[in-house]
UniProtKB/Swiss-Prot annotation:
Keyword 4Fe-4S: no
Family per record: Belongs to the universal ribosomal protein uL3 family.
Pfam family, one: Ribosomal_L3
Annotated TM spans: none
Origin species: Cyanothece sp. (strain PCC 7425 / ATCC 29141)
The name this protein goes by in its record: Large ribosomal subunit protein uL3
Length: 212
């Protein structure tokens, strides 16, 4: 995994390109993220950097967390996150990662917690079709068959049914950065990213999965 950055989703807006076409973008406050620890294969078994984000009051953290951050002379931070990389020698403890880590036109993956929708039914959660809406129908939004009869005599695990929708770790892949504002640490990403405004997100260079 390449090195990324933590940020806060601020909301969505639109900007216009040179041809006056509206582009929907999500504004993310990316960083600053000081590096609090560097892990190597010799000491930890794998190579990674640990970054912090979200300054808070000292009394909001435990003594163990404050002691860990003090080793890198980092102010109290709410979130810690690791990015695995084989190029740890390019980073130093105390170094601050900012929005200029990315550039306009770069393709990224954004990971966050999707908006929680509570207990949802079959149509909303899995896009099942409705039953007949006629006056005599008794099957408007029911699931239909959930399996066979006496054999196997049970519902197989993993059957799509009603339940909790959202509030899960989600990654939106292959999003394009439209603009970067290094002075204000803002990254404008084309399209939507997981979570509500104020949600924590992680931006990393795109990792192609499957066919290109």
């Amino acid at each position: 995994m390449a090195v990324g950055i933590l940020g806060t989703k601020l909301g969505m807006t639109q900007i216009f390109d040179q041809e006056r076409r509206a582009i929907p973008v999500t504004v993310v406050q990316a960083g600053p993220c000081p590096i609090t620890q560097i892990k190597t294969k010799q000491t930890d078994g794998y190579a990674a950097i640990q970054v912090a984000f979200g300054e808070v009051r000292a009394k909001s953290l435990s003594k163990a967390e404050l002691g860990h951050l003090a080793k890198s002379n980092t102010a109290p931070m709410r979130h810690l996150h690791e990015y695995r990389t084989g190029e740890v020698d390019q980073f130093q403890v105390g170094q601050v990662l900012k929005a200029d880590l990315f550039s306009a036109g770069q393709v990224v993956d954004v990971t966050g917690t999707s908006i929680g929708r509570g207990f949802a039914g079959y149509q909303k959660r899995h896009n099942f079709k409705r039953g007949p809406m006629a006056h005599g129908s008794k099957n408007h939004r029911l699931p239909g068959s959930t399996g066979a009869g006496t054999t196997p005599g049970r519902v197989y695990p993993g059957k799509r049914m009603a339940g909790q929708l959202g509030s899960a770790r989600t990654t939106i892949r292959q999003l394009t950065i439209v603009r970067v504002d290094p002075e204000r640490n803002l990254v404008l990403i084309k399209g939507a990213v997981p979570g509500k405004p104020g949600a924590l997100v992680s931006i990393t260079p795109a990792n192609s999965v499957g066919r290109k």
